[in-house]
Amino acid sequence: MSAHYATEPAPTASATLHTTFGPLHIALFAKQTPLTCRNFLQHCMDNYYAGTIFHRVVPDFIIQGGDPTGTGSGGTSIYEYPEFEYDPDARDPNEKVVLRDEIHSRLRFNRRGLVGMAKSEDGSYGSQFFITLANTERELNGQCTLFGRLEGDSLYNMLKIAEAERIEGTERPVYPVKITSCEVGDLGPFVDKVKKRQVVATGPKTEEKPAAKKKKKAKPGKALLSFGGDDEEDEDMPIRPAKPKFNPMLVTDTKLPEKESSTKGEASQTRKRPRSPSPKRQPQPSAPPKNRPKTPEPTKQLPLPNPESPERSPSPPPKQSFLSRTNAEIENLKASMRRTAHAPAAETKPKSALEAMIPQTAIRGRKRPPPGSVSASTSAPNGITGFSSNSAEAEALKMFNAFRAKLESSDSQPTAAAAKRLSVAKTDAAEERKETPDEDEESQLCDLHFIANCQSCKSWDNDVEGGANNGADDDVNDSGWLNHQLRFGKDTLGKDLNWKREHQDVDTLMVIDPREKEKELADSSRPGTKRVKGRGLERDRERERKKGRVGDLEWSKR
């Protein structure tokens, strides 16, 4: 990005377009493109773009707007107005200003967020502009004028506009983004040239019908003096008769001459009729009265209805549509296919209000009579036996004494029958081992660990190890396990300090110092020293003595 700023010139003017998706801050290259920037700034100053939309969205290319008509074919430049046709600061003040291409070598469409002027088919520019969404050097360089760039967070608002949903097959968005207002920031070199005008963006022209002119009432004609040359004109003009000089309401009805009556009839058409008493209207024949139902008199007896006469229905039955009739037939068919025979419901006794409050998952408990009651040892009507606290304590004490007597009478050693059975089982197993030959290793492998003669997978209740099933009852009845005591071997490894405290004279560890052994060997190898006899024997005797105290098993572990 720094390389772009190194090649691009610094912007000298700025403007902001406020849209429904957020503001678009545009920095303008007014020094490199003066005509285009002045056109854009003047439109922003006049609020020309307010109400316009972004009518064209091409993904990964451009978004286009600035057309007051919203069709892509409208919009004009300021140089088409008389006040901007001539520029007094130009080289030739008498030459009309035309908005043409302003191509600059340092302004290139090489990234997104660059603002350019949209060109019409005839090559002229108006008010429409576009914003690039990607690198468009191949399509737009040297073709259109680049006059600005977006700055700040406006890039994110531009991307939101570019994500708009479009009408299928076109480049027009379904819900186009609208420019709500315009704001001019820095005018740069156009401080004294760009001023606000009262110009509003014009939309598409609609043909208005001319308003119909109201017809004016003809004024009464005035009598004009007739001259020789005006005879023909006087014949065409109607002569208005003079107003009668009497009140017709006070004068009796007399016959007027025919000429006077004709003129009077013509005058009545051109002026208002005088007020006259309205003639009396003749009474029109009254319409026959409708047959309205009379309220029956309370004292009059009504006739009984004739059962043979057909009765009229109050309203015709509504006609069912074809769909409703079809659905009704389907429902009837489904109902006929269902099983209509129902199992007879079991008769249930009515529950009282208290029983209805008991949940269905509740378990009926044991009824206990109050302590000291007479019915403690009797049974309840529902079969549950009640008991008192005294009888329950006596029964529990009796069972406890029987169990304690059983413990005292039992022996920890197995009974003679069990010992005999165990010896017989061992002899039988030994005979079977001698008789049955060894099978292949593959047949002796366990299915879980694939180990020959696996003890983990071997059945613990095998007849060979546990004895025959014939003496199973004796094992169940054997009570020698009741007095069995759990005993552990001597802890000579130091896990339990009690054994060390009791046998402090036993040295469980034998320390051999190699330095002492080295000294002994060195002394014995010297020529002038006498070799002490019996020292090795004493060491061996001491080792045997310790070995006897500890035990052969523990000594082998060391």
From Swiss-Prot:
Recorded GO MF terms: peptidyl-prolyl cis-trans isomerase activity
Gene symbol of the encoding locus: cwc27
Record has Transmembrane as a keyword: no
Region of interest called Disordered, as start-end residue ranges on this chain: 201-388, 408-443, 510-558
Descriptive protein name: Peptidyl-prolyl isomerase cwc27
Pfam families hit by this protein: Pro_isomerase (PF00160)
Record-listed E.C. numbers: 5.2.1.8
PANTHER family: PEPTIDYL-PROLYL CIS-TRANS ISOMERASE-RELATED (PTHR45625), SPLICEOSOME-ASSOCIATED PROTEIN CWC27 HOMOLOG (PTHR45625:SF6)
UniProtKB keywords: Cytoplasm, Isomerase, mRNA processing, mRNA splicing, Nucleus, Rotamase, Spliceosome
Domain of life: Eukaryota
Family in the record: Belongs to the cyclophilin-type PPIase family. CWC27 subfamily.
Limits of the PPIase cyclophilin-type domain: 11-184
Keyword Nucleus among record annotations: yes
Feature: compositional bias, Polar residues: 374-388
Enzyme class: isomerase
